[in-house]
């Protein structure tokens, strides 16, 4: 998210001030070091500045401190999954447009409450489903809409991440979420985006073996089955298999693919092996995704590119222009996000 904000500022030559909600000094130091490193790499001088608000994890404290003498133009919520609802509700009640990293919330009733609140206050909520900006999936959407694969019959996806994600990266809150809400939900939205269909029925099965043996009470893997209804009232099946107990020696952080099969053809998107690998004497073979979020050299500085960056840039553009009636179809508003909750 920070690379996206800095890149947007650099490209558009717009001054931005970032207000960061912080719980502890250690987090502030980590942010400062990362910010200064990226600012120097991108060569943006003082276009972007920041300040901290120490709020002890309370969204109410954050708003009460900030609203004394400032005005927030846009909010981005990138925090543990189980906190999304509280912070989203507080910012919307303060009439601050927000972008929430997926999932919107962990419970449908929470998402419905946010939807109604957003509608009543006329304050937009977007969900950061960055895969909508992936050119593979944009091509899949166009192909589907042209009718190239006919009537959809079924879709399947396997999406996995390394063990280090639940064991190390998210250990402090991993038990309060699950692998499907954190990861698999991406491909629920992919079907919504590509086909425009509506979910009608859902069922899921999960297993707890490896992580429970490490004292972590959450699912290793969840297999989800969703029945979708198209705008033409035909039904098709989606299967999403997700886990976060992949070997740490995997050639990429994420293994992922997307397949959509119809009566006249099929669309196959290989989203891990994108044709770029690197092997050195010091590291195993790594599968590189050059399309997500990568930093590339320019003449005297660097720039971030990729669909992860485009998602943030698109949100900031929409907020600054306030043209919500003519949104890019890739922007996921809260109404569309309800399908993935």
Region annotations inferred by a language model:
Residues 26, 30, 301-313, 332-335, ...:
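Active-site loop of classical SDR/Rossmann-like NAD(P)-dependent oxidoreductases
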Residues 182-277, 310-326:
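Contiguous beta-strand/loop segments that form the cofactor/metal-binding neighborhood of enzyme cores
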Residues 41-73, 77:
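A structured beta-alpha segment of the ubiquitous adenosine-cofactor-binding alpha/beta core
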Residues 14-16, 94-96, 121-123, 233-237:
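A short helix->loop->beta-strand "cap" motif at the edges of active sites that frequently abuts
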Residues 1-45:
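N-terminal Rossmann-like dinucleotide-binding module
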Residues 74, 80-132:
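Beta-strand-loop-alpha-helix segment that lines the small-molecule cofactor/substrate pocket
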Residues 21-22, 43, 314-341:
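C-terminal helix-rich "cap/oligomerization" subdomain common to oxidoreductases
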Residues 131-217, 224:
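Predominantly a Rossmann-like dinucleotide-binding segment in NAD(P)-dependent oxidoreductases
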